[in-house]
Amino acid sequence: TADTLPLLRDGRGRPRLGAPFDLTDCNWSHSGDGLVVALGTSVQVGIDLEWLGPRPRAAALARRFFHPAEADWIESCPLEAHPTAFTRLWCAKEAVLKAHGHGLSFGLDRLRLEDDGEHIRLVDCDPALGRPGEWALTLLEPAPGYVGALAWRRPMAAPATS
């Protein structure tokens, strides 16, 4: 039951599960009436959910908080696509930062994503996040009017032995 689920927080405030679930990573997000939860074993997970509402200042917000290349991309989209483009990038960035444990205060401009309209991927990031290739991202459409993203850090491959 919810009363007996050992929900804890690490030193940065990132949620985690206590024993006997301490080998399972967890993360959650809510927006409006929506809630998403991510669980993972042997990976760090992060998830974000956002209501896809009007964002008349999407391009200006991207210019202020995102990597310059992402702001350029949003501005190159048709005006009516700005809110969706902005929200997809925001969700993916927040999911990566939540998985890593830094959160938004780390800086949304310290990671750069590419969105081809179908898939999104991390192409560059601050070394504190590891290498871009260590991260996987999946965009979600959990319900009409919502956009989400799930990020997980792949386990490091074991070194080759001779």
Residues of each region from the PLM?
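Core catalytic alpha/beta fold that binds nucleotide/phospho-ligands
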Residues: 1-162
